[in-house]
Amino acid sequence: MQIILLEKVANLGNLGDIVKVKDGYARNFLIPNRKARRATKEAIAEFEVRRAELEKIAAEKLAASQAVGEKLNGQSFEITQKSGVDGRLFGSVTNADVAELLKKAGFDVEKSQVRMPEGPLKMIGEHGVQVALHTDVVVDVTINVIGDHA
């Protein structure tokens, strides 16, 4: 299916690009989330009329993400979990736990924005986690997992 992108999409293209994607990806993700529209003649003409407005909105989102990223980058957060004497956690710290921790600290972060390269945290200690605030703004934070011996 040919679509026109209404915002920058990672690994796909930038605002205004006309790209070919699988039908399911377009119907189930891109179009419902208002990231794209079918690339019909009418849609392309309407996009060209609204292009400046969409570019302005995209620039505002990027600026807001960069401002939050400057505050968040390099910060360290602590979370306490039950653990055994050997330092292994009972359960794990997931991206949802990290997103909740960041929300309590005053940052508006969704769990889908938290990237954990090694998967959920299962040991006590300091761990690096990435937060993707925007497709162009990815910041690193440190999560210090403190063990609460049961």
Curated annotation (Swiss-Prot):
One of its GO terms (biological process) is translation. Keywords: Ribonucleoprotein, Ribosomal protein, RNA-binding, rRNA-binding. The keyword Ribonucleoprotein applies. One of its GO terms (molecular function) is rRNA binding. It comes from the Bacteria. Belongs to the bacterial ribosomal protein bL9 family. This is Large ribosomal subunit protein bL9. It comes from Burkholderia multivorans (strain ATCC 17616 / 249).
